[in-house]
Amino acid sequence: MGLIFQPLFWQYVATSYALMVLGFLDETVEKAIKSEGYCSRILRAQGGTRKEGYNEFSMRVEGDPEFYKPGNTYRVTILAVSPAYFRGFTLIALKEGKEGEKEEDHAGSFQIIDEEDTQFMSNCPVAVTESTPRRRTRIQVFWTAPSIGTGCVILKASIVQKKIIYFQDEGSLTKRMCELDLTLEGGNEKTIPDCCACGTAKYRLTFYGNWSEKAHPKDYPRRANHWSAIIGGSHSGEYVLWEYGQASDGVKQVAELGSPVKMEEEIRQKGDEVLTVIKAKAQWPAWQPLNVRAAPSAEFSVDRSRHLMSFLAMMGPSPDWNVGLTSEDLCTKECGWVQKVVQDLIPWDAGTDSGVTYESPNKPTIPQDKIRPLTSLDHPQSPSMTRGGPIIPIARVVIERIARKGEQCNIIPDNVDDIVADLVTEEKDEDDTPETCIYSNWSPWSACSSATCDKGKRMRQRMLKAQLDLSVPCPDTQDFEPCMGPGCSDDEASTCMMSEWITWSPCSASCGMGIEVRERYVKQFPEDGSLCKVPTEETEKCIVNEECEPSSCIVTEWAEWEECSATCRMGMKKRHRMIKMTPADGSMCKADTTEVEKCMMPECHTIPCVLSPWSEWSDCSVTCGKGTRTRQRMLKSPSELGDCNEELELKQVEKCMLPECPISCELTEWSYWSECNKSCGKGHMIRTRMITMEPQFGGAVCPETVQRKKCRLRKCQKSSGNERRHLKDAREKRRSEKIKEDSDGEQYPVCKMKPWTAWTECTKFCGGGIQERFMTVKKRFKSSQFTSCKDKKEIRACNVHPC
């Protein structure tokens, strides 16, 4: 009886399943006829029973945002809480208040992630549905938000669990999001919520430029079109790199010159408010296939206090137009880290230059405007798209989580690593290997013992090389840890899809013992963006010709090739290996340890030399008189790619003249004091100095040039006639001696002098001046020895009274 019943049962199941599939197909055809190309409310089980599914089914948008950013891409997930499941679904996005009867009622667009699981509806191309009616617990698609001005959007999902049971338009299957007003100060929600995630996360930012003549033909600049270097950072909510408000000096320099230097200084000055400075290379030209194949990218990290990221890049040439993200939150409300952000970027104006076309001359905006998005309603000469229509994105940024570090605090594990961590009840103690035990390094972990999606264990080994103290036991040479098998179903978000093992490589040794390797690769990474921990390489010992010749040596495998020596056209690259064991006979190892080969890089693309305008002249280098002033300009195109002359003038210097500097009075040093003008009694003596430079242009006036002081040699005494005669003779004697000295030691007068001239006029009317008089030679006498006489000069003070 049981044998008869079993085939009948399976026949009934197969028949029911076929009827269910036919029901779906009939329903799809019927709706296709009625919809006439548009989507009305689509029910996948019109005659079935509608139930409440608040506790079993839900639709989630990654990050659970209340607002959407125009052009941003979001991951949408429909979930069934175990043990519930569903077989079919429909997902649409409608403008608020619309029923989907017209094509323009729908908002944004969906992107298929897994074509084996989801597809666009044949009778409603803007909606997403299942590919096959099988059991499932989750599906995921990407939804790209509509352009600016769309307003609020409602995502609606319908769930078919069985042929006669469906769920639709309930709170958990409906998500309402409104457009974020980018013109508001800050461009984000009023407040940034605190982050509750644990540990850190590492992300990779990849920038895809789509600014090409084909996509944006109006006034496209064929010369020197480029993207500047990307500059940004991961930061806290206390710091804003840029926002839809006033541009900082760093933003202005990026927007006008494409230089990230000032912006990087501003970021680094914020200290602990910034975790990572994000930098990526510039792109010359702005679009080429290489930019898509090897798009500029940069890696950065976030943590609980610095969970926001911002960046910007200039499109050049342009007045001050840029693209970028500001304060993008990578922390989720579930205390985890966002897996992926994909956003199309539209240009924005920094508000520092009033130019309206790509190559408008510099026209500073005074006073400076606020940063604002470019729209199709800007100046008629602006290269914006169709007037009044949407702005076509000119770039796309993809931010992907590539690693998580530290203890994570997600409530629900979302990858194999998290599940394995739950299996370990106690952390292993630190390595307590005794110093007397010498081991080899641990081998790689073996494959998990479970071939299915179940708990298992894996093993690694090491060899005991030496036991220095036999009384001290050495720990085990094998180590085990729990693991999850690689056979998890496609519904597991953390499953890695692996290829088959590739055949074993040749043995690494030409003789004796070596190693052979086999590899496999990751065909598909987990949906949640976590890293695959499944081993991709296995090694095994191998023996070739058990006895090696004495002169042979053992070398390691070749290392990876180094980077090409050239950035374009022909270059050279190297790789190295090391000698593991020299020949047993002591001879030199003849194996090559370095290998060189040619490498070909993309064609060298030179670009026109692009210079910024000359800056204003600097102030004169002096405050008066003659000096110099300078002005500068910057090289905007990378020197390694441009055809700029190395001797290109980037700095100019010219002379400048300011009013004459004041010149103060200058004098000689004081002369020695003269002799006292009296031989006895009270007298005085003087000293003088000369003016070498009169004061000019308001300089300091000249001080006194004559100083006098009192002198007294001895008291004068009354003398008798003989004494007076004696004094007279003494004076005559001194006079004759003086004449002798003046005539270079002649014993007798050899010349006749003219009388003294009159005193010259005083050099000053007051404050001390000087007078001079002169005595010249009248006649010279000749003798057997030729001698000569000297002219004489006397100086005295005059007008010494104060002015």
Curated annotation (Swiss-Prot):
The alphabetized UniProt keywords are: Cell adhesion, Disulfide bond, Extracellular matrix, Glycoprotein, Metal-binding, Repeat, Secreted, Signal
> What positions belong to coiled-coil segments?
none
Q: Which residues form the Reelin domain?
A: 24-190
Which InterPro entries does its entry note?
Reeler_dom, Reeler_sf, Spondin/Thrombospondin_T1, Spondin_N, Spondin_N_sf, TSP1_rpt, TSP1_rpt_sf, TSP1_spondin_dom
The residue ranges of the Spondin domain are 191-383
Q: Per the record, which residues fall in region Disordered?
A: 353-389, 722-741
Q: Does the keyword Cell membrane apply?
A: no
**Pfam families membership:** Reeler, Spond_N, TSP1_spondin, TSP_1
Comp. bias regions, Polar residues: 354-365
> CDD domains under this entry?
Reeler
Domain (TSP type-1): give its ranges.
436-489, 495-549, 552-605, 608-662, 664-717, 750-802
Q: Which residues are glycosylated?
A: 210, 677
Q: Where in or outside the cell? A: Secreted, Extracellular space, Extracellular matrix
- Provide the tissue specificity: Expressed at high levels in the floor plate.
Q: Does the keyword Disulfide bond apply?
A: yes
Disulphide bridges? 39-124, 152-178, 195-331, 196-335, 198-409, 437-474, 448-483, 453-488, 496-532, 507-511, 542-548, 553-589, 564-568, 599-604
Give the residue range of the signal peptide. Answer: 1-23
Q: GO MF terms on file? A: metal ion binding
Principal location: secreted
SUPFAM superfamilies reported for this sequence: TSP-1 type 1 repeat
**A GO term from the CC aspect:** extracellular matrix
* Descriptive protein name: Spondin-1
Species this protein is from: Xenopus laevis (African clawed frog)
